[in-house]
């Protein structure tokens, strides 16, 4: 039997998933959270999908072994490439999985007026077709325009400065989306909410942006409540952080993403069995 006092576990390739945790701390402040940033493998966006699936299975195993009542894939590439393997591991522990793709697709399909939805994501996410399938499953004959933006997540993860070069890069990625006349854009990478103001300026005020954080926090709340695992009461929850790469660089960027003090970040190392 899973105990409601256990934490919600989430992972991402880096710090992007903290945009999801940020929304969870607002919507569900009484819950405990464990967050793992797999920074030694960042970025996931260009990696071999077979290698990624093995990695995701291992991360799911490690997090659930520690004890968790829910597993959140706070990474679009990991969801697109490895949701199935994460679910297989979680099933052995009797734990449910909340991914990041489907909740966003549902919101985008519900709010579009002209049926033209853009997706800005990593190369792996676009090539997986995960968003296209999730949007087609909404059954509304939507027109989906996907654009791979491979340089954007590394740029954000490194904490680079926003300058003219960045704007030019973003304009290049947004050009086909503008041309297609989308009215809704899915930010298909949990790093991208940090550049939402820039994207909004380029696309214009009539394009609605759908980020993962809000959609996933709502899905987590629904899942916990329906399974009777939501934490009762008003106590302030705890959060702890693990990084597979250097903790100092993780801490600096992560504090900016979360807008909260991180406390100690612990480094974990594990290798995928060949």
What are the roles of these predicted feature ranges?
Residues 1-274:
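Non-catalytic structural scaffold of enzyme domains
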